[in-house]
Amino acid sequence: MVKVKICGITNLEDALFCAKEGADYIGVITYPKSPRYTSKEKRLEIIKALEGLNVKKVAVVVNEPYEFIKELLDEGFDLIQLHGDEDIELGKRVGLDKVIKVFRVKEEIPKVGEWEKAYAILLDTFSKEAYGGTGKTFNWEIAKKLVEEGHKVFLSGGLNPENVKEGIEFVKPYGVDVSSGVEKEKGKKDFKKVREFIKRTKSE
């Protein structure tokens, strides 16, 4: 069954709702320039509330040093999503089995080879303005090709309850990742959309 990652969680209520509805991964953003940025205090609150629930906690970082990433793992995050221009050496230092490496897709197939031992790769839509949360899709042929090559892929970028089923059928990813596609406003999830997104993904 295809896994669901709900990203851009900023508050306790959203985190618990997503986990109880069947999300497999909850993503919390530590990048201060993101409109979905979550402070350390709030992060710790979310992690504590999710203890004992069958959901993996993912910290999303953009070009942060190893020391900060280690702090996040010590806080209780299961996985680190490297969403910037991080190199493989940082990935190895963190432990590739704990890393989801993001590739922001333009027109060509990204070179993912050296990250093949990572927990997974996540394909998102390239934008000059933002690291993720763009609400725009990219050419799914690229994602499909990487899946066919045997990579463990999270499909992201512009997914919502209306198109997620089509994306899954075409790409056949390991998982799907959504943020803005299930929001009522930046940083606040729309519970109806979350429920519908998970339902349509899990019906595959």
Curated annotation (Swiss-Prot):
GO terms for biological process: L-tryptophan biosynthetic process. Pathway: Amino-acid biosynthesis; L-tryptophan biosynthesis; L-tryptophan from chorismate: step 3/5. Keywords: Amino-acid biosynthesis, Aromatic amino acid biosynthesis, Isomerase, Tryptophan biosynthesis. Its EC number is 5.3.1.24. It is an enzyme of class 5 (isomerase). GO terms for molecular function: phosphoribosylanthranilate isomerase activity. It catalyses: N-(5-phospho-beta-D-ribosyl)anthranilate = 1-(2-carboxyphenylamino)-1-deoxy-D-ribulose 5-phosphate. InterPro entries: Aldolase_TIM (IPR013785), PRAI_dom (IPR001240), RibuloseP-bd_barrel (IPR011060), TrpF_fam (IPR044643). It comes from the Bacteria. HAMAP family: PRAI. PANTHER family: N-(5'-PHOSPHORIBOSYL)ANTHRANILATE ISOMERASE (PTHR42894:SF1). Belongs to the TrpF family. This is N-(5'-phosphoribosyl)anthranilate isomerase.
